[in-house]
Amino acid sequence: MRAILAGGGTGGHVIPALAIAQELKNVHGAEVIFIGTQRGIETRLVPAAGFSLKLVKVGALNRVSFSTRIKTMFDLPKAILESRRIIREFKPDVMIGVGGYASGPAMLAARLCRVPTVIFEPNIYPGFANRLVAPFAAAAAVHFQETCKHFRQCTVTGVPVRQAFFNLPQRRADGRRNLLVFGGSQGARAINNAIVEALPQLYAAIPGLHIVHQTGEKEYETVARAYLDPLVAAEVSPFIDDMPRAFAEADLVICRSGASTVAEITAAAKPAIFIPLPTAADDHQRKNAEALVDAGAAKLIPQSELNAERLVSEVCELLGNSTSLEGMSAAARKLSHPNAAAEIATMAVGVAGKTKRAARV
């Protein structure tokens, strides 16, 4: 069997796609390649994982300037033709579109070549590329039940995350209250600024508070200076290499609400305060966060309302109430999907097999 995974751009698209690819390769013996763009994180992550990456030239259509949209419209036919060439050379049995720049043209090319397609949509509201190809996809794998209204043949599989998030070591009983803060791999200035401003009040209000703070590369030195007080217990770094360990120690997490982060929160069963990125396409981060808030697993602070006072109030309320934290943790655990990669891979294999059987009839 041969499969193409198409799309990328951000870690939220690429990291789950790699988990699906590994499952297809290791469990189903599939030969797998990726279609992406030069501008996405897939150029680094996909080859590093041992998979071939084919590149097409296409940009964004949604939430971009008029000139960028016009340029993308001109690039789109060429990207479809290039994707069709890749498909004809590789001869896949199925294509999985994971959203992002390359997903739309590649999935349209698959339609032209009569290759069956599966959509993977990690966000509660589908991205533009997945909405574009939804009418002809054979199946869709999603994270939230609400997302199914946008697709035919939809299955709630969850988002693949590393198994380590499901198998966290027991939190040690050391009397500390541990707060984990991060804004994604690049950090988040709004979150950094609010935390720095809130530090004196947080440490005064919460005895034994310990903060682990991922700042992002650009703001590390500025943020780290705020933690220089020898009485402040903290670990500050531009990037956390062992995020499962950081999750294991955390009583509460403050973070954005991209699809992968939300999936990791549920896998680790950690209470969270989400601060959605307001510029995210289709406001999907807010919608992701609201799904967990509605389930009782998280709190939400809009970035427009984020300040030191609001942050201190929310953090103190939660860290001062173990019953609330335990309830949020239990609610998050109910939303987790430990077998997501296996379910999506099995779905793709089933779609490919069904098409082959139909062709023989």
Curated annotation (Swiss-Prot):
InterPro entries, per database record: GlcNAc_MurG, Glyco_trans_28_C, GlycoTrans_28_N
Covalent S-S links between cysteines: none
Subcellular location: Cell inner membrane
Entry keyword Cell division: yes
Topological relation to the membrane, as annotated: Peripheral membrane protein
Annotated metabolic or biological route of this protein: Cell wall biogenesis; peptidoglycan biosynthesis
Keywords: Cell cycle, Cell division, Cell inner membrane, Cell membrane, Cell shape, Cell wall biogenesis/degradation, Glycosyltransferase, Membrane, Peptidoglycan synthesis, Transferase
EC nos: 2.4.1.227
Catalytic EC class: transferase
Family matches, as Pfam families: Glyco_tran_28_C, Glyco_transf_28
One term under GO cellular component: plasma membrane
Reactions catalysed: di-trans,octa-cis-undecaprenyl diphospho-N-acetyl-alpha-D-muramoyl-L-alanyl-D-glutamyl-meso-2,6-diaminopimeloyl-D-alanyl-D-alanine + UDP-N-acetyl-alpha-D-glucosamine = di-trans,octa-cis-undecaprenyl diphospho-[N-acetyl-alpha-D-glucosaminyl-(1->4)]-N-acetyl-alpha-D-muramoyl-L-alanyl-D-glutamyl-meso-2,6-diaminopimeloyl-D-alanyl-D-alanine + UDP + H(+)
Domain of life of the organism encoding this protein: Bacteria
Gene3D superfamilies the record matches: Glycogen Phosphorylase B
Positions of UDP-N-acetyl-alpha-D-glucosamine binding: T10, G11, G12, N123, R162, S185, I240, Q285
Protein family: Belongs to the glycosyltransferase 28 family. MurG subfamily.
HAMAP family reported in the protein's UniProt record: MurG
NCBIfam families named among the record's database cross-references: murG
Record function comment: Cell wall formation. Catalyzes the transfer of a GlcNAc subunit on undecaprenyl-pyrophosphoryl-MurNAc-pentapeptide (lipid intermediate I) to form undecaprenyl-pyrophosphoryl-MurNAc-(pentapeptide)GlcNAc (lipid intermediate II).
Protein name: UDP-N-acetylglucosamine--N-acetylmuramyl-(pentapeptide) pyrophosphoryl-undecaprenol N-acetylglucosamine transferase
Origin species: Koribacter versatilis (strain Ellin345)
Gene from which the chain derives: murG
